[in-house]
């Protein structure tokens, strides 16, 4: 990204971390000192998880670089303040916060452009990944919260996977998968065959079983 933006004479004016997982809070020193925002809840989770997140950076992260977890600021409202986004004065960039994948996770909705940046939600290469072990209800609530902006979006960009101009298909696929798992049915979802998703599916089935058992007791 550094080389790509430099070749096009683009300047980083701000950043938004959708949630407190290490791969979504990365930062390159050459991006400069642009403001970096996240939700207050995500910042709280960063404080609680920091040791683990630092370990997850691994040996590939240059030791001489500043920690990417330093310098993040909590949003004071459900919108990104200027100077984030130089596309035009007053362009609204609204956050849609939920706890579906991680506490304080937020999508970023650029309504004037019809673009939804979904973070670790609504992927075509990952199953729904609720916060293990007991936040499946929060994930269902997250899909409900996202539904309105997904319906308006022309383009959806997930944190992992491919952008799509058919956002509702992603939402429908996740709901259909979770409906099957919650009902105890075999979920016919091709994403189960992808790397790491077999284990993820087993965990989701475990969560759904615990939820059903709790509701019936």
Task: Label each PLM-derived region with a short phrase.
Residues 7, 43-99, 103-174:
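Metallo-beta-lactamase
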Residues 40-44, 122, 183:
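Short, acidic/turn-prone active-site loops that include or flank metal/cofactor-
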Residues 148-155, 162-217:
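Accessory terminal helices/loops
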Residues 2, 27-30, 50-51, 130, ...:
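Short amphipathic alpha-helical segments
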Residues 5, 27-32, 89, 110, ...:
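Alpha-helix C-terminal capping segments
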Residues 1-41:
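Active-site metal-binding motif and surrounding structural segment of the metallo-beta-lactamase
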Residues 10, 34, 91, 153-154:
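A structural micro-motif
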